[in-house]
Structures are given as structure tokens and as C-alpha cells.
């Protein structure tokens, strides 16, 4: 047997094996858990860790660095605290917290790290890595808001118009219809999607019940809105860190669409819960607290998030130089995109002068204020027109709507005052009586059921009837019936020559003559029956 072994063959085999040995050493910077409690771990040994860097524990759970101290690192856990023990090994990933974004995300429900929650498998297609934290575009890369974002709600589109690239706050007590306004806005983008000009929607659920999120996703799916929508969910059962990072994940996804030249809408529902989650994390990290025990940088938290909403300049060569562009987007940047933000804030007993509400009001470009009393009286959406405002949306409103509804906001505010005075007065002059009657009827016109957004052409047609006193012969309790009959007749006989023309921003004598004739014909039976 030994005679058959040739030394040359042995040396050849040994040489082959030696060639296959990898002599490169892989160094991982690791540390150990000193202490863990309430979703925060203190780690010793990671001297070169960076702020917002992802860390990985030996059991696969991830954390994000938030505190950099002399002898240890404070990291917030993105998984269950009970699975982390003292002494566990932690390694740096050398990656700043980010999310992988792509077209395959549309129609999916994910967590703030991009992990699917809907049981429909991994997210497919090409993905770009987008950092959760990123500087907002500089002034030179922006352009003024000049294009409308139609919500499908008459009250909003007529009196508090929203433009693409705007930040419009939705504020009110619990159970006043804040989420409904945001969901109706998402549903109203279906016509844009079908026309091949989609506004991609991102709904961020922060600290809500899992059942509420599931019901909402079901509503969007039933109405065909999930085709252009992504839901980011950090429910009440998730760690505070995930609830804190959820809005940043939504902003990062929106920026992917914005920077590739498309329009996106992100809804943060709601930032009050994010502020509470951030307060919880900050207090556990022993950061100094300020007013209402919130940390000192709570204003900066919301301002740096909401400043990321913008309308990007139309010049391609300028857009390509945008500050803080992620490497994954190089070569894919297109000019003219937009990211619109609808942050939601919950107030306590209508107190808009509290700390977080005043912060966000001062950051945003306007607010839609919802009132419990109006909601309980059946005026839905329950918008208080007097203190709701849109600071930049007016320049984005289409001309036909501006012409028809230009004075509606002031008229309705004056009607409220006149009605309050009329309670103390027994006799009224005819002008005041007429103004109050018109105000009441306009109020009825502005009532809109949930999940039934209206095309802008129909909105303008029916509001023309209200603002031009075409309802004077219709009894107050019949206004809703008049609206239904009027719009049915307009859709059947005047879709192209009136409604489509109004939608394009044009209003002329021919169009108004048709509206007045149809309104007179529709009002006739209501007048007779009275």
C-alpha cells in the first residue's frame, strides 16, 4: 500500500489545500451588555460606535445607538427586552439605521425596519437603501407649492386647500374624525392612479391597536387603494423605539418616490404618540427632561421630520446636486417630485395651546382643526372653519374652485357670528336672515359621509349652487336630497361639458348657465312639496 503513494502527489494535494485557506482575518468590533431594562441596553466596549448605528445581539435582535457616553453606549432595542441578558455579546453592523425601499413595497404592511407584517412573503423587486434620518432638502432644491392635492372633501378643497409638498396638520380630540380625513384623502388618489399619474401614499400607524390597523388596511384594500399605498405599522404592543422610528421610516419611503420624480403623500397617525414614545426612551436613557417631562429636543424631533416634506425644483441638473442624497439613489434622481405630509395630533379637551400641539402648529403650513361639538351635532367632517387655515395651499387651488369658493370661508365664519347674535334678537332684517339661511344650507352641503370622496368637478358645481343662492327655495332639511339629485343629473347629462371642464380649472358663462338651469330644474319638486 505504501509503495503506491508518490511523494509528488502528496505535496500537490497539500499545496492545493494550502491555497484554499483564507488568510484574511475578519474583525468584528464587539461589546457586552452591562445592563438592560425597559427597552434600553447599556453596552460596554463599542468605542467606535456611531449615533443611529444598528447593533446586532448574538441572538439576532437589533438595536439602535442613541446615547454615546464616555465608557458605554446606550442603545434602544427593536425587539423584546426579556430576550436580552447581561453579558450578551453585541457587534457593530457599521450601518446607520435605514430601510430598503422599492416598488415591491406597494400594497404591503411593514414595520419601521421594512420587515413585512402581512404574511405575504418577502418584498420583491429592486430595493434602494434609504436612511431613516436624513437632512431635509435645502432651499435651493425646492420650489413653491403650486399644484393641488385634492382630498375629495368639499370643506378642505374649498376652504383649506392643500398643495403638493405642503405640511398640513390635522388636529383635534380623540374620536373627532382625524384619521377619516387622512383615509379619505388616500382613497381620493385612486383617480390619479387610474389616470397614470399616481400619488403614492404612505400611512404610518404609531401606537395604535393592531385590530385598528388591520381594519384600516382592510378598508383600503376593499376600495382598491392598497395598489398605491404602503402601511408602516408600529402598534401599541411594539417597543417604544419602534414607535419613535416609525414616522422616520414613512418619511424615508416618501423620499424615495419624491427623489425619483414622483408625488407622494405621507400620513403620520399620530405624532402625539411618537412624542410620548420618545419621552419614554429619553427618560430611560437618563436624558434631562423639560416641560411636561419631554426632552429638550422634542421640537427638533418634529421639525426635522416634517421639513423633509417638499416640492422639489423642476431643473434636473440642480435636483441631482441635492444635499444628503443616499448613495443608492445616485443616477436615479429625477426633478419635480413632491412629498406632502399630513401629521395628526390628538388634543386633550380641545386644548390647542398645550406643548406638542403648539410645537407642531408652528412647524406646519396650516392646520385643520376638528371639534367634538360639531362632530356630535352631525357636521362631519367636523372642521372648525374659523381657526383652520392653509398658509400655502391657496396658490395651488385650481382657478375654477378659487372663483366659486373664494369667499366661502369668510361667509361661513360670518354666518357663525350672525347665528350667535340671532339667538338674542327677536326680529332680523332681511339681509341678515338671508345670510343665516345661506350659511345653514352651505353647512348642509359641506357635510360628507365617511369614505366617499367627491371629484373636484362635482364639488365646484354643488358649491356654486350654495354660494350663488340657488338653494333659496329648497327647505333646509331637503338640501342633502337636492345635492344627490343635482349631482346625478350632472353626471348623467353634463359630465364632459361641465364637470370635466370645471375639473380642468375652467369656469365660464356657458358652464354657469348650465349649472343654474340644472339647479333650477332640480329645486322645482322640492319647492312644490314644501
Curated annotation (Swiss-Prot):
It comes from the Bacteria. Gene3D superfamilies: 2.40.30.20, ATP synthase alpha/beta chain, C-terminal domain (1.20.150.20), P-loop containing nucleotide triphosphate hydrolases (3.40.50.300). The record marks 388 as: Required for activity. One of its GO terms (molecular function) is proton-transporting ATP synthase activity, rotational mechanism. InterPro entries: ATP_synth_asu-like_sf (IPR023366), ATP_synth_asu_C (IPR000793), ATP_synth_asu_C_sf (IPR038376), ATP_synth_F1_a_nt-bd_dom (IPR033732), ATP_synth_F1_asu (IPR005294), ATPase_a/bsu_AS (IPR020003), ATPase_F1/V1/A1_a/bsu_N (IPR004100), ATPase_F1/V1/A1_a/bsu_N_sf (IPR036121). It holds the Pfam family ATP-synt_ab_N. It is found in: Cell inner membrane. GO terms for cellular component: plasma membrane; proton-transporting ATP synthase complex. Keywords: ATP synthesis, ATP-binding, Cell inner membrane, Cell membrane, CF(1), Hydrogen ion transport, Ion transport, Membrane, Nucleotide-binding, Translocase, Transport. It catalyses: ATP + H2O + 4 H(+)(in) = ADP + phosphate + 5 H(+)(out). It is a peripheral membrane protein. ATP binds at residues 172-179. Its EC number is 7.1.2.2. The keyword Methyltransferase does not apply. F-type ATPases have 2 components, CF(1) - the catalytic core - and CF(0) - the membrane proton channel. CF(1) has five subunits: alpha(3), beta(3), gamma(1), delta(1), epsilon(1). CF(0) has three main subunits: a(1), b(2) and c(9-12). The alpha and beta chains form an alternating ring which encloses part of the gamma chain. CF(1) is attached to CF(0) by a central stalk formed by the gamma and epsilon chains, while a peripheral stalk is formed by the delta and b chains. Belongs to the ATPase alpha/beta chains family. Produces ATP from ADP in the presence of a proton gradient across the membrane. The alpha chain is a regulatory subunit. This is ATP synthase subunit alpha. It comes from Phocaeicola vulgatus (strain ATCC 8482 / DSM 1447 / JCM 5826 / CCUG 4940 / NBRC 14291 / NCTC 11154) (Bacteroides vulgatus). The gene is atpA.
Amino acid at each position: 500500500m505504501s509503495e503506491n503513494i508518490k511523494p509528488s502527489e502528496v505535496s500537490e494535494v497539500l499545496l492545493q489545500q494550502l491555497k484554499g485557506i483564507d488568510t484574511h482575518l475578519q474583525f468584528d468590533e464587539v461589546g457586552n451588555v452591562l445592563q438592560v431594562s425597559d427597552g434600553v441596553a447599556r453596552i460596554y466596549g463599542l468605542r467606535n460606535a456611531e449615533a443611529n448605528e444598528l447593533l446586532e445581539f448574538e441572538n439576532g435582535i437589533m438595536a439602535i445607538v442613541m446615547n454615546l457616553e464616555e465608557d458605554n453606549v446606550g442603545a434602544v432595542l427593536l425587539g423584546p427586552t426579556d430576550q436580552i441578558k447581561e453579558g450578551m455579546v453585541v457587534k457593530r453592523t457599521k450601518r446607520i439605521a435605514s430601510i430598503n425601499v422599492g416598488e415591491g413595497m406597494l400594497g404591503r404592511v411593514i414595520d419601521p425596519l421594512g420587515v413585512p407584517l402581512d404574511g405575504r412573503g418577502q418584498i420583491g423587486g429592486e430595493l434602494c437603501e434609504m436612511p431613516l434620518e436624513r437632512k431635509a432638502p435645502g432651499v435651493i432644491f425646492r420650489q413653491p407649492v403650486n399644484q393641488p392635492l385634492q382630498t375629495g372633501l368639499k370643506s378642505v378643497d374649498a376652504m383649506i386647500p392643500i398643495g403638493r409638498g405642503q405640511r398640513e396638520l390635522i388636529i383635534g380630540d380623540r374620536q373627532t374624525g382625524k384619521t377619516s380625513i387622512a383615509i379619505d384623502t388616500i382613497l381620493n388618489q385612486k383617480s390619479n392612479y387610474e389616470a397614470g399619474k399616481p400619488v403614492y401614499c404612505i400611512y404610518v400607524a404609531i401606537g395604535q391597536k393592531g385590530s385598528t390597523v388591520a381594519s384600516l388596511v382592510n378598508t383600503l384594500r376593499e376600495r382598491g387603494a392598497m395598489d398605491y399605498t404602503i402601511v408602516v405599522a408600529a402598534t401599541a404592543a411594539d417597543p417604544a423605539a419602534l414607535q419613535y422610528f416609525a414616522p422616520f421610516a414613512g418619511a424615508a419611503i416618501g423620499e424615495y418616490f419624491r427623489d425619483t420624480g414622483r408625488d407622494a403623500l405621507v400620513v403620520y397617525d399620530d405624532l402625539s404618540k411618537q412624542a410620548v414614545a420618545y419621552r419614554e426612551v429619553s427618560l430611560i436613557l437618563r436624558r434631562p427632561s423639560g416641560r411636561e417631562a419631554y426632552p429638550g429636543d422634542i421640537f427638533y424631533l418634529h421639525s426635522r421630520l416634517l421639513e423633509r416634506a417638499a416640492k422639489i425644483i423642476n431643473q434636473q441638473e440642480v435636483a441631482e446636486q441635492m444635499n444628503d442624497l443616499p448613495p443608492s439613489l445616485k443616477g436615479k434622481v429625477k426633478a419635480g417630485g413632491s412629498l406632502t405630509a399630513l401629521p395628526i395630533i390628538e388634543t386633550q379637551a380641545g386644548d390647542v395651546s398645550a406643548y406638542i400641539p403648539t410645537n407642531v402648529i408652528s412647524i406646519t403650513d396650516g392646520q385643520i382643526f376638528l371639534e367634538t361639538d360639531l362632530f356630535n351635532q352631525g357636521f362631519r367632517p367636523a372642521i372648525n372653519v374659523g381657526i383652520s387655515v392653509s398658509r400655502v395651499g391657496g396658490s395651488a387651488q385650481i382657478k375654477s374652485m378659487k372663483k366659486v369658493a373664494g369667499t366661502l370661508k369668510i361667509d361661513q365664519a360670518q354666518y357663525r357670528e350672525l347665528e350667535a347674535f340671532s339667538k338674542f334678537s327677536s326680529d332680523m332684517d332681511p339681509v341678515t336672515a338671508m345670510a343665516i339661511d345661506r350659511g345653514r344650507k352651505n353647512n348642509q352641503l359641506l357635510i360628507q359621509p365617511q369614505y366617499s370622496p367627491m371629484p373636484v368637478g362635482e364639488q365646484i358645481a354643488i358649491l356654486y349652487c350654495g354660494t350663488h343662492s340657488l338653494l333659496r327655495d329648497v327647505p333646509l332639511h331637503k338640501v342633502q336630497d337636492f345635492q344627490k339629485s343635482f349631482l346625478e343629473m350632472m353626471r348623467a347629462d353634463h359630465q364632459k361639458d361641465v364637470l370635466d371642464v370645471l375639473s380642468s380649472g375652467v369656469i365660464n358663462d356657458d358652464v354657469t348657465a348650465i349649472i343654474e338651469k340644472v339647479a333650477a330644474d332640480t329645486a322645482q319638486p322640492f319647492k312644490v312639496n314644501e
